[in-house]
Amino acid sequence: MPETKVEKKEPVSLASLMTPSKTVTIDFPGFAEMTVDLCYLAREELVRLRKKCLSTKWNKKTRQPEEELNEDKFLVEYCKGVIKGWKGLKYRYLEELLLVDVGDFDPEDCLPYTQDNAELLMKNASDFDTWVTETVGDLENFTGNK
């Protein structure tokens, strides 16, 4: 009986399958036609982002160095890494998210996405901040398995 050769496949490396980030467009709950482009960051990316915002200070009482997170810098870096854009953020929606005076604008017009606008919204609108953080933290939002 002739011998059949069985080809041995090289094992697949998980590292070759992993992707550090993925951006998807997600509907913002409660606001018709408003979508936010969010980027999922792998744990390694989040750790790298956090490390950028750490500084070491000397504690005179304990005589030990202590790491301190610069929260403002972290918010800037987090927004840059996670919020990639939005569409349909009407001025009337802003009134439900934070205290604003939009009387000079058509309530149906939209606030354009800018890095500064994203940071201010994250800093001052706790509902938006909470939603972004929870949505980005849920891997299913980025895998299509929901």
Language model regions located:
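Generic detection of short hydrophobic beta-strand segments and adjacent strand-loop junctions
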Residues: 22-26
